[in-house]
Amino acid sequence: MARCERLRGAALRDVLGQAQGVLFDCDGVLWNGERIVPGAPELLQRLAQAGKATLFVSNNSRRARPELALRFARLGFTGLRAEELFSSAVCAARLLRQRLPGPPDAPGAVFVLGGEGLRAELRAAGLRLAGDPGDDPRVRAVLVGYDEHFSFAKLTEACAHLRDPDCLLVATDRDPWHPLTDGSRTPGTGSLAAAVETASGRQALVVGKPSPYMFQCITEDFSVDPARMLMVGDRLETDILFGHRCGMTTVLTLTGVSSLEEAQAYLAAGQHDLVPHYYVESIADLMEGLGGLSPPPQFPDPVDGGYRP
């Protein structure tokens, strides 16, 4: 049972020593806006030197995978492969490839509520989007992502497509809001998805955390044992719940959204799926447990391109 204990000393060395690898959330864990969390790039280098594989899971659907990889590099995180980055955009593209209804020779199009990064990820997966040049195929899925230009007109069009019972409704995530560096908030995809669900009377399939589908995408590309993986995140209702649902050891870092007091309140209320096994002030605190670790076997190379037909 998770007890929200501080991870340090012998416990830290034992947890890292037994771990196959680490899944990191990004926003609030590795960086906040354009400011990296002090020590984060060095930690990833130390984990690599110790033979611990690192993968990255983000509900941010605004960037296509190549663009997200460039962001890592620009902020000083070097030596990463794009195939190690799993965003809700990547997972949405995969789910739609797998589940889009319709005959193979006319799979239909996706109506997207989202930005150009999400659209680019879908096109890279071979999906057709409503409004693209060429024939106007039947819309067979509505995808709700982070859309800074969400409008009544877009909501109306989405609901019109969803009157077809065979049209899928997919959401990248349910994050209701996101913190801004000035302390204010901006609506998240979860708020937009709730509007579409309410107006259409449909329930969305969600691909991002805490949905286990994101971990399924990882296991399709990498040989991972969830019992030997750490999930490190800053949001209890997203990252920590995701870790518990997938059978991982969970670590809350206090550099982002959730506080230690919130975790302790969930513990007192018996909501154990929202309570981390451990917490750290910052992921830089994990470096203390890496001394003297010998490299275990690495993950095999991922499937070509990260997509499966």
Curated annotation (Swiss-Prot):
Lipid bilayer topology: Peripheral membrane protein
Binding positions (Mg(2+)): D25, D27, D234
Cofactor: Mg(2+)
Subcellular location: Cytoplasm, Cytosol; Cytoplasm, Cytoskeleton; Cell projection, Ruffle membrane; Cell projection, Lamellipodium membrane
EC number, as in UniProt: 3.1.3.16, 3.1.3.74
Positions contributing to substrate binding: S58, N59, N60, H178, K209
One Pfam family cited in the UniProt record for this chain: Hydrolase_6
Chief location of this protein within or outside the cell: cytoplasm
Top EC category: hydrolase
Gene Ontology biological process terms from the UniProt entry: actin rod assembly; cellular response to ATP; positive regulation of actin filament depolymerization; protein dephosphorylation; pyridoxal phosphate catabolic process; regulation of cytokinesis; regulation of mitotic nuclear division; regulation of modification of postsynaptic structure
Entry-linked InterPro entries: HAD-like_sf, HAD-SF_hydro_IIA, HAD_sf, PGP_euk
GO MF entries: growth factor binding; heat shock protein binding; magnesium ion binding; phosphoprotein phosphatase activity; protein homodimerization activity; protein serine/threonine phosphatase activity; pyridoxal phosphatase activity
Active site, UniProt feature: D25 (nucleophile), D27 (proton donor)
Reactions accelerated catalytically: pyridoxal 5'-phosphate + H2O = pyridoxal + phosphate; pyridoxine 5'-phosphate + H2O = pyridoxine + phosphate; pyridoxamine + phosphate = pyridoxamine 5'-phosphate + H2O; O-phospho-L-seryl-[protein] + H2O = L-seryl-[protein] + phosphate
Domain of life according to the entry: Eukaryota
Cofactor binding notes: Divalent metal ions. Mg(2+) is the most effective.
Keyword Secreted part of the UniProt annotation: no
Keyword annotations of the record: Cell membrane, Cell projection, Cytoplasm, Cytoskeleton, Hydrolase, Magnesium, Membrane, Metal-binding, Pyridoxal phosphate
GO CC, alphabetical: actin cytoskeleton; cell-cell junction; cleavage furrow; contractile ring; cytoplasm; cytosol; glutamatergic synapse; lamellipodium
Family the entry assigns: Belongs to the HAD-like hydrolase superfamily.
Function: Functions as a pyridoxal phosphate (PLP) phosphatase, which also catalyzes the dephosphorylation of pyridoxine 5'-phosphate (PNP) and pyridoxamine 5'-phosphate (PMP), with order of substrate preference PLP > PNP > PMP and therefore plays a role in vitamin B6 metabolism. Also functions as a protein serine phosphatase that specifically dephosphorylates 'Ser-3' in proteins of the actin-depolymerizing factor (ADF)/cofilin family like CFL1 and DSTN. Thereby, regulates cofilin-dependent actin cytoskeleton reorganization, being required for normal progress through mitosis and normal cytokinesis.
Subunit structure: Homodimer.
The protein's name in its UniProt record: Chronophin
Protein source organism: Rattus norvegicus
